[in-house]
Amino acid sequence: MGCYGDKLANTPHVDTLAKRGMLFKLAWSCAPVCAPARTTIITGMYPPSIGGQHMRSMVPLPEEVQFYPAFLRKQGYYCTNTAKTDYNVSTSDTGWNASSRQAHYKNREPGQPFFAIFNSAVSHESKIRTRPHEKVLDPASVRVPAYHPDNAEIRQDWAQYYDIVSRADAIAGQKLAELDRAGLTEETIVFYYGDHGSGMARGKRWPYNSGLAVPMVVYFPDKWKQLAPKEYKAGGTSDRLVNFVDLAPTLLSLAGVKPPEWMQGHAFAGTHQQKKPKYMFGFRDRMDERYDFIRTVTDGRFHYIRNYNPHFIYGQFVQYNFVTPSTSAWKRDYDAGTLNEAQSHFWNLKPTEELYDLEADPDEVNNLVDSPQHRAKLKKLRKAQQDWCREIRDLGFLPEGEIHSRSQGTTPREMGLDDNKYPFESIFAAASIATERGEAALPQLKKNLGHADSAVRYWGAVGILNRGVGATAASRDELVAALEDESTYVRVVAALALGKFAEEADVRRGVEVLVELSNWTPQTDVFTSMAALNALDKLDDKAAFRLETIKSLPLGGGASPHGRYNGYVKNLVGKTLSDLGASPGKKK
């Protein structure tokens, strides 16, 4: 956007709003994808603390947790949303007076205060690949980030993204003009922000700054200057770190409501402003059909990333993302061996930790984890990330299905606060050891495989998988025994380790277990099926001897929290069969 210094951007309306108001130099969406990001906004809570971090998880909330518009309605506000919701939690009251394409503040009672959200989808990921497209910006003029290869598809998609952001700006201009025609400009506080980073691969879905950073512009008319952030100045900027988790408490504060204790953000405006936070946090978990687990923190300059699934590459095949031409072209060039190290990083296994200097390296391609001069910063941010996970009782350390099974009769949030149901420290310690590298921890990993808690056993198996051939061979007996563990998630990881790294007989054992657990029926668990299918896909030709069974796997029909799970399972089965040269119902 032009107001953020991009010389190619054509965003005159938001630029003008920034000149009249103030922009935050660094704002994060908390999650680099829509549903968990919007869950953060609507609750004022970090989704990993309530079990809502996975796409379309639809978890229940504790009774006292309400969507923030419900608080505004109690204050007399007419609350409208036009029209996207896409939250990862279920509730009987979304808080809105109206939420639809027709919802509008003009429908309020005369003189009634209003709170209105207008969503624009014209710059959505799907619009980057819409063809035909009337070009405005010349693809030759765009700056290709250091992590992307410089090819025609990348340039075309980046140029088209600039064009559709200009359309989003035009829609913002229409809404501001509409407000002005209603005589409400000097009566109304305005926020403008994005959903998450761009829809390009390594933007949306990935918790680098390119996926988390969003524009955040606020305008306070003179009438309401007393409610503005303390540093507010027309045409100014703020170095305060603003996260989507801060929006709900801020909006309540603007309405004169003290944010409830269960909200985890910090109000940056209104009558209950709080001091600037030292850090901002982000996360990545299951993105559509693909599992991952990443936590991040920034102090505004340095960005620390902790990968809890380093045994998965960044660029796992997400069907929806690979429809975009630049994504497929990027993978094509990687397979051809034409990329440099920075451009190849996305398609390789992750390191356990990453540290980037956002000022010196805005594209985040120079990992400073091994830099002696950055050792103190690394330790500080590592501790901040660990402290945050403890503070919020991060539920990401449980396999997704266990979030649901352990919270039967209650909610994931309440379960997560109960040490009897979620012994956090034991599980967190097991995950920390599992996702490091080196053989020294192997005795502890084997011990964890025999632990009473299934999540500790799960991380024991992950730790062996993460360490590869040698650890798998040294733990062969324990892994074979784990194929019969009462936890299906332990079985999946043990089977994947054997399937990837063991001798032929044990490879076949692993494949048999994964094929069995992939079978999603009305009596089975969709989360187990998805975990098993993800693992099966990573075995490629090793699973070919069970091709006919894989072709017959059901693509839906079992219970799930959301209708999109049918598509997730279909995508996973389809990708596995495609790699084996087949398709559902078609013999190889």
Model-derived regions, located:
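Short hydrophobic beta-strand that contains or immediately precedes a catalytic carboxylate
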Residues: L355-Y356
